[in-house]
Amino acid sequence: GLGDVYKRQEEFRAGTLDEVPVWMNKNGRIMLVKYMAVRDRNGQYIGTLELVQDMEFAREYFERKHD
């Protein structure tokens, strides 16, 4: 939830966390959302990058592998 977002940003700012992966099901598809701290050359936190990847290919691969 929103509390998790604020906690993650505080940890990014403090330098205690650099990346958070979040797996979710979106409209029946497996998605991986990665939140990554963006830092300047001095290591100062300047923002968060959100990367969303459709991981459905992985489910399809493993389902075929077990046939």
Model regions and ranges:
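Conserved mixed alpha/beta catalytic, RNA-binding, or beta-rich assembly cores of soluble enzyme
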Residues: 8-12
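Sensory coupling linkers of modular signal transduction proteins
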Residues: 41-67
